[in-house]
Amino acid sequence: MEPVTINLEQATVRFGDKTALDNFTGEFTPGTVTALIGGDGAGKTTLLKLLAGRLRTHSGNNSGYAVDRHNVGYQPADSGVWRHLSVAENIEFVARTYGLSPDKARTRSEELLTKAGLDHVPNRLAGRLSGGMRQKLGVVLATLHQPGLVLLDEPTTGVDPISRAELWSLIAATAAEGATVIFATTYLDEAERATRLFLLDHGTLLGVGTPTK
């Protein structure tokens, strides 16, 4: 894992004449979990895609990105799994994509699947998993190659309480390994899991804080 520190200063992203992210300033550092909080259209996904290197700023003074794609783990809002593949085949595909050795992929996937409570369904098609199980598999796939930057778009949406606890165990373990973890959510109670919070609305940063402030 290569540690990732990103500083954005007055970062702006536009789509045509629409400003999706307006003068965003923030820092993201290794070993932390940052929550992007806001409703639909707040700019959370735009910011995640920017940090992932999938978008470019139209203005701003920024450092630390775009991160090499092999050092990024990204889970989109739809879980990011291939539904026509089994759990094991999803893992094999991602492992090959990032050049993991068979031994490394096996050891790492066994560890993550156990933490996610998915170790009993390796041969099940992802399309036949529950929504919560697919979300957990999405986080497993995003963190399989131990990236320095992990980006999760509403990873707990539609997830039952038990699966949510397993998800947070995965996310906390990823940060403890030294990754810079950033997740988007519409739930204020999710903020308690974060090291730092960014409140967004219509692409504008309204406030920055911690769970205790």
Protein language model features and the residues they cover:
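Catalytic Walker B motif of ABC-type/P-loop ATPase nucleotide-binding domains
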Residues: V150-E154
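The feature captures the beta-strand-to-loop junction immediately N-terminal to the Walker
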Residues: I37-G39
